[in-house]
């Protein structure tokens, strides 16, 4: 059994970093999966809905806030989000096995990237560069992490409309930097991230 883990939102100047953990059944339509960066926003949403609608897909989302990013740095906050995502998936997997009278087996984990988070309760864990382009479970995780974070940033735009989060999702675009310059930092700004010419 394989669990894929990936993150979204390491680079933005605002908002949380998000991670997803996913286990896919053999019956899943793998042909719809790609690295989230290679899909349009509309297509990512379509795939997200397909994943959510499949009762045999086990998934969970984890978050680390901008405050946690500022306190422990973006790499450690990314690991924290991944650990939280896996903890959620682990509980769902236990419940899934119990409901289906299946034997519970701790999954093997593949994490996209170079670094391995401190995840317990797994059979094995390894990091694989570009796993989001080669491992279906990680592709699915990249899509869920990206869409979850995008939806969160859209919700933040309702609270802080002057920053335009619904458009740039917190990334350091010219419009975002201009909004920070004019309005000051919002409560979801990452204070530890250096912004040139601010």
UniProtKB/Swiss-Prot annotation:
Binding, a divalent metal cation: 6-7, 112
EC number: 3.1.26.4
A GO biological-process term: mismatch repair
Uppermost EC category: hydrolase
Main location: cytoplasm
Record CDD domains: RNase_HII_bacteria_HII_like
The name this protein goes by in its record: Ribonuclease HII
